[in-house]
């Protein structure tokens, strides 16, 4: 149950573009607080796994696809409070503004040379100001937010599983103890679907 709750999130489309949009939304919010107005450029640095899974993913409700569009949409109009559903709440005019940035070549995607399999960094610039954000290890685990180079949030050296949320399970923990046999044994011998807290599965079915 802890793994399901940790690994499953409601998202607009695939989780990887959602994580990119969330990171960009955090960076965009930081930019606006620093004094930037209309987004001029967006740079995304991500791990190979994120790029592989997000590069050609479509964005529901639009004709757009790819992490460049996800980043632009998040940066221009995203509110990070919506987490991986952030693109659901961006108005049409801001969607079009984001698309114009991509078409003008103002959104760059680069490979981040990092050990993490899940890593997204977004830098947004406007009016001489910058906003920067980093998501790492888990799709909604924001570990860094900066306004003009000054950190307003810095959890880069914090273990997400030790940050106070008992439901968080890191990929390393999953790899350490999860096997096909342990999943089978849990489902056939321990899981009680009528009483165990499996709300995330019910939400997934409803979606």
Feature map (PLM): residue ranges:
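Short, Gly/Pro- and small/polar-rich lid/capping loops
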Residues: 1-9, 17-18, 22, 101-103
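Generic N-terminal amphipathic, Lys/Arg-enriched alpha-helix
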Residues: 1-12, 179-186
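Short, N-terminal intrinsically disordered low-complexity segments that are rich in Pro/Gly
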Residues: 8-17, 190, 194
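Active-site nucleophile and cofactor-binding loops and adjacent substrate-binding regions
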Residues: 12-17, 60-64, 88
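Alpha-helical support elements that line or immediately flank enzyme active sites
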Residues: 17-35
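Flexible, glycine/charged-enriched surface loops at secondary-structure junctions
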Residues: 34-41, 82-87, 108-110, 194-198
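A structural-propensity feature for long, helix-poor, extended segments
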Residues: 41-82, 95-107
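Signature of multi-pass transmembrane helix bundles
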Residues: 103-207
């Amino acid at each position: 149950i802890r793994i399901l709750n940790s690994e499953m999130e409601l998202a607009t489309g695939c989780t990887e573009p959602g994580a990119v949009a969330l990171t960009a939304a955090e960076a965009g919010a930081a930019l606006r607080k620093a004094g930037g107005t209309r987004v001029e450029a967006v740079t995304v640095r991500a791990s190979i796994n994120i790029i592989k899974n997000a590069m050609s993913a479509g964005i529901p409700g639009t004709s757009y696809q790819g992490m460049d569009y996800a980043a632009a949409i998040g940066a221009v109009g995203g509110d990070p409070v919506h987490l991986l559903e952030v693109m659901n709440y961006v108005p049409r005019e801001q969607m079009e503004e984001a698309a114009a940035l991509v078409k003008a070549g103002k959104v760059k995607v680069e490979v981040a040379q990092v050990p993490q399999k899940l890593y997204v960094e977004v830098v947004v610039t406007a009016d001489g100001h910058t906003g920067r954000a980093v998501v790492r290890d888990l799709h909604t685990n924001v570990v860094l937010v900066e306004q003009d180079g000054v950190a307003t949030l810095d959890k880069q050296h914090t273990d997400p599983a030790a940050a106070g949320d008992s439901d968080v399970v890191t990929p390393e923990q999953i790899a350490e103890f999860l096997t096909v046999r342990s999943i089978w044994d849990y489902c056939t011998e321990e899981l009680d679907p009528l009483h165990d807290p499996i709300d995330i599965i019910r939400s997934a079915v409803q979606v």
